[in-house]
Amino acid sequence: MKKFLFWIFFVGFLCVGCENVQLSVENQSSDIKQLSSSYVGKKVSFACWNVQTFFDAKTDGTEYDEFKKSDSWNSGKYCKRLERLCEVMKSLNSDVIVLEEIESISVVQDISNYLVDGKWDKSKNWNYVCFARNKGTSIGCAVFSRYPVKKLLIHNLDIRVQKVKQPSCRPLMQVTINIDEKDLVLFVNHWKSKSGGEIETEIWRDWQEALLGERLVCDFSFSEKNAYVLCGDFNRSVEDFVCNFDRKPECTDANVALRAFGHEKSNFVCVYSPWFDFSTEKGSYFYNGNWERIDNIFSFGSLKISEFMVESDGKLVKEDGSPFKYSIYNGEGYSDHFPLVCNLLL
């Protein structure tokens, strides 16, 4: 069983809840679908961003090689990078911000301190933060929220049926946030990269998709009134999921089908991606001369997404329109991904 590190804290106050889950195939009796409703409720601004290998200046041994071997990486550059990250977060000003590729809880605490900057404003600060990373791995994910975080569950793969050994895979975070007496459930993802070959590694992203689908189905079967957001860096473009553009009755208002073992009527669960309806952007990630939509925000349950866009203006973008990737050698840039932003209607 994998060991994992997880934290939920309110300005230094620690309280945690967790669950380590092995993927299994079970029968569920619930009728799962994307709910359709004209109701427009509470508006919550939301952002999701892969901040590109955000390490501190302390060597722990799990850093990527370029950070361990580079003489140019130091505390001064780290502090400058912290300032830039916090400037972007303040500019986004989203109520909930999800960050991928954060090294540790120490980095999360540094971000929190830089965001406060000696000024306490309960209405503007992100007073609730949680973080998770598997022990011995390099990076994890963090959630910054202006609303109370009720619960954090951690789900890990433990696959032993493939002919090859399961590689290291990052955990799935399930974060429950209470917003005006209503629960918003986040499933935060950072799936297996394509390093080692896109085809060769696709099986592990398939398993991570199945884990996500199963956890979503399971939670929804107990709390059908909840609003769900599935977000993160999936290392799979949205067009490469099973897409349902016909909007069939069983997938009302949904356009993507996720594999989900345990669904009695089918082996998928229907979710909604705003990429196809709202955004005219080519993508959020630029690699080998091609735009990709591997960063995603999906909705499910009693939730609508509005005003979805890629934040690709200002300092985050290079002259050619691609993300201003961070370089440890000159200390310039931000990330090789653009942030995704939207409004959630609960």
Q: What are the language-model segments listed below?
A:
Residues M1-F4, D233:
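Positively charged n-region of N-terminal signal peptides that target proteins for export
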